[in-house]
Amino acid sequence: MASLATLVLDLDGTIVDSLPDLTAALNRLMTARGLAGFPAPSVAAMVGDGTTKLVERAFAARSGQARHGDIDAFVADYTAHATEATRAYPGVEDTLGRLKASGWQFAICTNKTVAATHAVLDALGLADWFAALGCGDTFPVRKPNPAHLLGTLDAAGGDPRRAVMVGDHANDIAVARGAGMPSIFAAWGYGAPSMAEGASAVAERFAALATLGPKLLT
């Protein structure tokens, strides 16, 4: 029997708008270290490569260097507050429902930690939609390394020949290219429009995935 078609999605800036909680946690860390915080658009430009890079970029932007324990402190604080203002984008469950009814399954490939990913999905009631979660600490590698995407797809029982990657960052487009899969750039997310370069398609809203996904596999 042929495997289900699989839509693999990034999390932050693709399924959920987590920027308010990420910004708040980062600014609490900056304040604790005697440094100025950041407006949300500046934080948006720093996300996409995982927690370590986010914290390192924040300190570098303030001409500083993250100290031992800063990253762990951020992760602990953010995870504890990860769902205070985070919300799913409009149309997420309706769109997933439409695709599921036509023979699709879903997985998440994110550089976010397992703990924070579970916290967000559980709080928003989204966890049951996904056959597999490939997080930033699930495998030895992370996006844009294609092994992250392929490992996630394998965990979902999917076939790369019948899968599409969706995300709002250049890493999402690059990981799909490396895995030999089509990709959709999530233009509603945090990534600059230039990050769509190389994507198979661009979606302006989540609901568009219901038609774009199937088109890319025909």
Residue ranges and their predicted role:
Residues 26, 92-122:
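Substrate-recognition element of Asp-dependent hydrolases with the DxDx(T/V) motif
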Residues 2-94, 113:
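N-terminal helical cap/lid subdomain that shapes the substrate entry/recognition surface
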